[in-house]
Amino acid sequence: MTKLTIHSPAGLHQVDVADGQTVREALDTTDWRVRAACGGIGSCGACVVQVKSGDVNPLTLPEYQRLDEAARAKGWRLSCQLRLNGDTQIHTTHLAKPSPWRSIPKADLMQHTLQCKDISQYVYGIAVDLGTTHLRVTLWNRRTGQRIASRKGVNPQDSYGADVLTRLDVALQHPEKARKLSEFARVAIIKALRDMLAREVGEIKSMLSEIGQVMIVGNTAMLTLLTNHGYADLLNPDFWQTQIHCQPVDYDEWHAQWLLPHAKITVLPPVAGFVGSDLTADLVATKLCNSSNAAMLIDVGTNTEIALWTGKKLLITSVPGGSALESVGIQNGMPPESGAIVHIKQSENGLIVETIDNDLALGFCGSGLLDAIAVLVATKVLKPSGRFAQSTGGAGFALIADNPHTMIIGRDIDAFQRAKAAIASAMETLLEFAQMSWDEIERLCVCGAFGRHLNIENAQALGLLPPISPEKIELNADASLAGCELALLCKDNVALFEKMTANAQTYNLSLIPSYEDRYINHLLLKPIKSGEFS
């Protein structure tokens, strides 16, 4: 990683740039996007920046074509052609208008080799992963198997509640708000698509008519709210072990709103109850069931979905994993964006606090909250019960003394304990049904945005992850999006998903007494015990 310092009318900013990444690609993942309209090939000339100092790559052919000699002499470059060989400072006045959309870093996206070579028209398609907190969308040329662009942003439905149950209740009690929730999600999807087309292709209207497929996955609650259909069944426990029907009632309305006249819109069906098609996408992307070895998958989020593959059969469940793991409802919680604390380490000289973009700490994202609690337990500031060893007078504990944004209070710790207890208890209960122990698990996939920056050692120390070798644990943050992309590129996409979970056994843990007993035990901030379950 090299450091890029940006001087602009909006202020001074620093960004980490990965090896091989262009300056534009790095800026597209932040709040400081430059203007662009050609997808990074250097033909539009809109993304100009001025290099003030640093070691950078030589001028490219597109730069000789788009920039005159005087501009080149003053250090002006096209950011889509500019790569860093060392720490660099640039100046720009060509920032794009503020946008809620960011590119997904390429390192976070899985690579695929599938192609739909027999497609002769309407070759473009989009994959949509609709989560409770975030929305992720990618644009593809299905015939060539090329991912053209990606976008992520906040799910605007959060204005009606941070968690799924609140939104479902709002929809059930207020039909007009249910329509609003559906509208919010649909508008967000098309806005993400239009942002990609404007910046990466330079053309919107004609490209919309060339899109032939829209593939959507998500947790069941989000799918019912998107389609405005099926959410009443989801709130009925009698349906928690059956598939919830949540397909759009009027596809013509969607086509008209999105201006996608030729697109086949597919909402991939959920498995059952609160287990959505995002879990199936995880299974497809990670190939969890492609081996005879026992494996487990956890998609951590506000609604956490868990799958256990015994080598022969698939067991599935879901639990309210707690919005605390996404820092929702935490006093100083925030999404994983600039200024969010992502890692905390204890050193001889005190705490090392790492934030996204190395900005001033503004709060905790999920992984930062976990690290903070782990450090407080390790230094005996916190007891395993979750209580502070010494009274804080209700004020909590600030990791950085003069920064109130690093304060953790008792309510934050309690929310984390409830979330991790629900997940740990669910994992053990599935093992009980399979008559297995942790020693038999050869692979554990942690999916969802929470896993992107997760410190595995700390997660095990607090009892969120099981006592297996860290080498067996994989972090697959964008697996559900990757699975959706594979479905987009596969002719038999719906059949692929249905086959994956056709013989799965789904469990409603609210009906299992042993789950409740385990939940109480797992509230303590200590490692999960190894062994068999009965």
Language-model features: locations:
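Glycine-rich phosphate-binding loop of actin/hexokinase-like ATP-binding domains
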Residues: 137, 145-163, 232-246, 281, ...
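Phosphate/ATP-binding catalytic cores across multiple sugar-kinase/actin-like superfamilies
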Residues: 188-199, 279-282, 417-439
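Acidic, glycine/GT-rich loop-and beta-edge segments that sit at the periphery of enzyme/chaperone cores
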Residues: 4, 76, 95, 99, ...
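Conserved phosphate-binding catalytic cores of ATP/NTP-utilizing and phosphoryl-transfer enzymes
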Residues: 106-123, 265-295
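N-terminal phosphate-binding loop and adjacent alpha-helix
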Residues: 157-199, 329, 340-345, 418, ...
